[in-house]
Swiss-Prot record:
Protein name stated in the entry: Molybdopterin synthase catalytic subunit
Cystine crosslinks: none
UniProt organism field: Haemophilus influenzae (strain ATCC 51907 / DSM 11121 / KW20 / Rd)
Any one GO biological process: Mo-molybdopterin cofactor biosynthetic process
Residue positions binding substrate: 37-39, 103-104, 119, 126-128
Gene Ontology cellular-component annotations: cytosol
Family the UniProt entry places it in: Belongs to the MoaE family.
Described function: Converts molybdopterin precursor Z into molybdopterin. This requires the incorporation of two sulfur atoms into precursor Z to generate a dithiolene group. The sulfur is provided by MoaD.
Name of the gene this protein is made from: moaE
Amino acid sequence: MTDIQIAVQEQPFDQNAVYQWLSEQHSIGATVIFVGKVRDLNLGDEVSSLYLEHYPAMTEKALNEIVAQAKVRWDIQRVSVIHRVGLLQTGDEIVLVGVSSAHRGDAYHANEFIMDFLKSKAPFWKKEQTNQGERWIEARESDKEALEKW
């Protein structure tokens, strides 16, 4: 069984199943899971839905490279990255990043690192449906700044 699970999918993910997989080894003392959701407000406008596109194969390659970098920097045992694509509604879960390790510090830092790099380096494109119409979402300056701490 591999220690990395990466999926780009349209269907919802099962947080409980991911947690069970991440934490099933007895050497694991910490499991950190981040779940991102579609917000109902962005840039001052009400958001009703979000459409996510990706570049198949290239996206998975980028996610694998990000996870590989995290595994070099921290002593982590298992990683799960699931990112949804397609049409999502307000409140839907978009992304899950889960990391397990013997110690919480490694799990926390690796999880944040993976999420920060996923936001800026993985080829996903987001189009929001708002009360003002449709718009493509540009990368935020705060996402770029988050990379600088690493």
